[in-house]
């Protein structure tokens, strides 16, 4: 039976000043749609996986445009709820040279932010599903959404599904204290956790300095697995090596052992969605029974390729990821 993946979260309208302009000087915005779990669903659909996305969007034409942006890549949209008045928006000022990325959210009062538990029939949504994925951004939206996530996780576990969560801490959405309280409840149901150093510090106040010589990502993973019943913790990190170049590497920790990917050195076109692409690569690897080393290489390569694709969605194929992960084909002209 083919795996059926369900992802859950908020898709938003992303507005970015053209030509790397600042907010204060732009006269036009580039508009695309995206959001953590939507990005993961699109990546999986491009990998020929049965990927389904659940959210709530207004009935007007902008809500429909967001749905169309998913449907065109083969994402299942049958369980998207329609209602409310607004779609969430985020304004993105892209990193350029030494100038950092700046994100401004305009999502309060969106259809998804005002969604209630009655909007989502998890028995129907999870019919024949094998995997449920969401991120820590979703429960951060409201107390109601925290409870909805818990209900969804409980139902997924009842049905024998695998549950994965990208912790994805956002300090602009909630405090460390509130994040810790909510995610501590949610993580009791999670099998596969994706977390980096910032997540561990921001949510659970972990201190990598306590690693005593152990590689910090492995230390964080091991400590998280002491707190929660995770079967696997994965992490991906990007290190700036110069003003224009970055290094990407990732790790999978499972059954007491850390597995590291090779490093990629890269220039960045658009890094938004790179973590979501990693999640998709990891889910694809696990549903196809890749061993941990193959899984970490595939997931890291998927994330690397997202840095070359404009917009939130990672529009690459399994073949492209495989060639980058396991050969030098990425340096050749594909004829």
Predicted features and spans:
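Positively charged, low-complexity intrinsically disordered leader regions
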Residues: 1-22
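Beta-barrel outer-membrane channel/assembly domains of diderm bacteria
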Residues: 11-17, 39-46
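Short pre-catalytic strand/loop immediately N-terminal to key active-site residues, enriched for Gly-Thr
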Residues: 24-34, 259-273
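Alpha-helix C-terminal capping segments
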Residues: 40-50, 285-288
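Conserved N-terminal subdomain of the carbohydrate kinase-like
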Residues: 50-137, 321-335
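A short helix->loop->beta-strand "cap" motif at the edges of active sites that frequently abuts
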Residues: 157-162, 228-231
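Conserved phosphate/ATP/ADP-binding segment of small-molecule kinases
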Residues: 173-255
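Conserved post-catalytic alpha-helical subdomain immediately downstream of the catalytic base
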Residues: 262-328
